[in-house]
């Protein structure tokens, strides 16, 4: 059921030494008529944190496994209990090695797998797909104005948005996510 057909991103931009691409917030609300356990499957090109109804549910740090996404794209799975009524998914998506400016030593700026950070997410209950990543996700730059695997991050607290992954947050001024061309790699469980 999970496929790499539904990748989305926040921007077309690439990180360079002259211009950094911030990590982006992504959020999406949806309605559930009943409380039930659902499975989230997420494949990411970049590093991410995932939030459900305001709670960080990410497994570990620097998720997912690092890979050449022309070969493999690792995905993670989570189980959550849906609330009756509104539910919200939040994702903080950083560059990881996917959008690394590289340099003279590592040449990541010339890597064939290079792209703006992107992800594909499916929420399922048994065989039923409840939600998948699409342009209905809303995006906004996060306080992480620059993140690089080797050079660290620049954090600007002026961009903090309290409650951005909570149910009652107003995201009406946020932009819509963009569709992304999926990498060629084979999907593998992390």
Report the location of each language-model feature.
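Pocket-edge structural micro-motifs
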Residues: 11, 42, 178
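Accessory beta-strand-rich segments of carbohydrate-active enzymes
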Residues: 15-16, 21, 26-160
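Edge strands and adjacent loops of beta-rich recognition modules
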Residues: 178-190
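Non-catalytic, glycine-rich low-complexity segments
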Residues: 1-29, 188-190
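Extended, acidic-biased charged interface segments
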Residues: 158, 162, 177-180
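An acidic-aromatic substrate-binding cleft motif
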Residues: 165
């Amino acid at each position: 059921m999970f496929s790499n057909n539904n990748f989305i991103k926040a921007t077309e931009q690439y990180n360079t030494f002259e211009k950094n691409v911030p990590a982006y917030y992504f959020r999406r609300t949806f309605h559930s008529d009943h409380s039930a356990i659902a499975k989230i499957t997420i494949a990411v090109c970049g590093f991410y944190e995932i939030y459900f109804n305001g709670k960080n549910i990410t497994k570990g740090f620097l998720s997912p496994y690092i890979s050449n996404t022309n070969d493999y794209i690792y995905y993670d799975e989570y189980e959550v209990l849906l609330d009756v009524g509104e539910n919200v998914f939040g994702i903080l998506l950083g560059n990881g090695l996917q959008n690394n400016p590289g340099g003279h030593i590592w040449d990541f700026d010339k890597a064939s797998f290079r792209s703006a950070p992107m992800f594909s997410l499916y929420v399922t209950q048994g065989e039923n797909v409840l939600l998948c990543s699409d342009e209905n996700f809303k995006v906004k730059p996060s306080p992480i104005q620059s993140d690089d695997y080797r050079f660290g991050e620049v954090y600007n607290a002026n961009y903090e948005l309290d409650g951005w992954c909570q149910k009652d947050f107003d995201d009406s001024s946020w932009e819509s996510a963009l569709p992304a061309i999926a990498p060629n790699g084979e999907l593998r469980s992390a």
